[in-house]
Amino acid sequence: MISRLFAAESRSFAAPENLGTEAFLTEHTGPGEMTLFLWQNERTVVIGRNQNAWKECRLDALNRDGGTLVRRLSGGGAVFHDLGNLNVSFCVPRAEEDIPGQTQIILNALQKLGVRASRSGRNDLEIDGRKFSGHAVYRQGASSCHHATLMLNVDRESLEKYLCVSPLKLQSRGVDSVRARVVNLSERFPSLTIPALCTALKDAFSEAYGLPAEPYPWKERLAGNGGDRLRSLQDRFSS
């Protein structure tokens, strides 16, 4: 049973730091604890655990533009991150894993801001039949991490420039159809902002469990070897 909630927001826009921090939060989740982690990456392609980078993105273009490529711990497809995207992570003991419940927190937060979204399939959220959020999960020891992207105002030109669309998708749907399936929330809700979304997510997180979301206890968790472990995890995503 969840008895304590934490909320953490990253001040870094560097993908290796953020993915390392997410892994640290997941690894250091105690019994009955749950952490909401909110973070953003600047000009980054994130590929799934088993993906071939050369097949999923145009590495030459990404490198030429000073972008970053990282491999996350979860499976799923390649995604493009910039500062128009918000990443949401739920770090929790495996015994308390509740993907539908955590997804509902995101939907509730969006509803607070006037956005009525719905689930599509196993891993997506959409509005009017167009996807703005993808989800994935990984498990690490006794802990679980469910993370999601939320496209608020992502640069669509960069997304199309760096990501390779599957030939099968192009063959079956066509370029225009593939583009039309993805939407920025700002296209429908131009006044929506990242800070407002972060506040709504923290409020919905707290309301879902009837508990206050405390600031993450960094001083306590980084004591002893904690700081070295965090740096080690961040370095792993840099290589």
Protein language model regions, located:
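N-terminal lobe of the biotin/lipoate ligase/transferase fold
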Residues: 1-97
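Short, conserved charged micro-motifs
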Residues: 55-57, 96-101, 158, 193-196
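Short, glycine/charge-rich beta-strand/loop segments that flank catalytic centers
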Residues: 40-43, 120-129
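Contiguous, small/hydrophobic- and glycine-enriched helical/loop subdomains that border
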Residues: 85-123
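Short acidic (Asp/Glu) patches
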Residues: 55-56, 65-75, 101-106, 110-113, ...
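Long, highly charged amphipathic alpha-helices
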Residues: 20, 24, 101-108, 112, ...
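Long, positively charged amphipathic alpha-helical accessory segments at protein N-termini or as interdomain linkers
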Residues: 113, 133, 141-239
